[in-house]
Amino acid sequence: MKHLWCICVFFLTSCATKGILETHILQGEPGEVDVIVFSSTDCPIANAMAPEIERIHISVQNAGGDLFLVHVWAGRTNIDAQKHADDYGLTMEVIIDTEHELVDSFNATVTPEAVVVLYDEDGTPKVIYQGLVNNLFDSPGNRRDEATQHYVRDAVAAGIKNEAISTSYRAPTGCIIEQKQ
Amino acid sequence: MIEILLATVFAQQEEPRVPTWKQDVHEIILSNCMPCHSSGGAGAFHLLRYEDVAGRASFIVELTRNGVMPPWKVDDSGLPVHHKRGISKEEIETIQRWIDAGKPEGDGAEIAICGGGLVIPDATGHTNPDTPWIIPAESAARWHKGIRDKRTFVLPINNPNPMKVTSLKFSTTAPRAVQMVCFVFDHQGRARMFDGWDPDEPGYEMMGDIGWVPSGAHGKIGPGSGVVSLPHGFHWEVPPNIDVVAETHFRPTGKIEQLSLSVDLFEDAIEGSRAVQEIVSMIRRIVIEADDDAFVATEHLDIPIAVDVIGITPRAGAECSGMNISSTNSEGTKQLLLSYSDWDPHYGETVFFTKPFRVMKGDTITSAWNFNNSDSNPRNPFVPAQFIDLARKTGVANFVLHVAPVQVEQASDLYEWNLSMLRKRQRAVQ
């Protein structure tokens, strides 16, 4: 299990672009579940899952947690992210990981890639699931009409109930995150 | 000493040059990724500037190595076809070496890739732009699963005179959501009747078949293609006031999209141009058990009139995993015409051969469709796999052969034979 680090990133809220740099630290109460989804404003695979990601956000929020959408491509600005959130009806907090600090921390490889975090009794965050959001895409170019397996949804539900998760990692498929040079 | 010097010289000559964006990579992108990955194209993102490509270079290499991009599913084993898309191994390797070298931009003038010029059509049809069809953010089951993520639209051409159509160009306001469009020319107003059933909604929720004519009989476009262009010397005869019926297959993009369509028809028929007809090879019904991953359906057609086959439009659902069509002459010589070893219904555009293939009277056209009704088929719409019993009067799996009779005066005989075959198959399978 990996532990979350405190990371300095740019961030904005979904409805009003603050446009300022702030320090953002992931924190949670014991038993709380947070979700991080690595994404990109123009990755068609991540975008196709936007409604599902928003549904997960609502369910996590209702349980007291948060979902953070992390845009990974360096060319993105707050304005791009705000327009993307508006277009796709996303209401979660959006992070632009310009320097790939979050990408490197979680060894994220593609978008979309999800990380589900459960805070234990003393508030220590632990990754209980990482990988595929669902099985809408078998691989890039191989898309089902609709997803039939909902891995993140299931992991969140299990985390909230503090139940064990059978598979903690599913190799994600999507748009490759270009390595920083 | 001389040997050492020569070895050094040769070693220096064999040292591959480091590729740069300006000298090497932009040309590869230009020839393989345009026009989709530019403004108004179907590509999800632009690949025009250095930053666009450098920011996705590894993804580009993966998709091209895996054959996902450029979109092209036709096997090389059939007849040579026009407008084949495919990036070479050498080109992919060049992009990889460019990545390994740190993606140098190179010296020279700033390079950005630009689009093409303006071509004026002879006739145009479009849906009402004031009432676009709303593509939902996610796929939604409709009144039966067979028409999921499909909508058929009527595009009146209002041509006062008959036309000899040689090509058809498609445009849409939602190019990233539209994956495939199957066209039929309707001169009987049948599609208008279907469209009128729900006057408040643009289009209608049915396949684009018109009578016995399957959707796509007059061309089909897929990812990477927006034009159906008949080979030189052939045309479609189109009567006055034709409607172009556009069975539109869309892929929800995650956000609501407003869909309007238009088609441009072009007349560029030369003197002596031959009218094209459609011979339909098909399986009307399939019955497949759950988990059967190797079900094969075949059909044989004995061609009664010599024809030149200029192209083929394939059609089958996602439960189909592969298909091929071949011709066998009276001496038993078999020629594979078209083959898909990895069929994806969203990539089944019309293909035209670089040279017409002549089928003589009495030759046999054999079609075979492979179905994988198991969970190992990543596109199987029936998940978990379930018993399938599908039937359609225009066929659940087809090859539409675009042909011209060798003897022009036999055109009506060919038409009548094709129609009788379609009726016969409908009676035979209940």
Predicted regions and their residues:
Chain A
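Sec-dependent N-terminal signal peptides
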Residues: 4-12
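Short active-site neighborhood of thiol/selenol oxidoreductases, capturing the structured segment around
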Residues: 29-44, 156
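Loop/turn elements at helix/coil->beta-strand transitions in domains of secreted/extracellular proteins
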Residues: 31-34, 63-66, 90-92, 111
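Second-shell loop/turn segments in exported
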Residues: 40-42, 69-74, 139-145
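The canonical Cys-X-X-Cys-His
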Residues: 43-46, 114
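Structural microenvironment flanking redox-active thiols in thiol-disulfide oxidoreductases
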Residues: 47-87, 98-105
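Thiol/selenol-based redox catalytic cores and closely related redox-interacting motifs
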Residues: 99-181
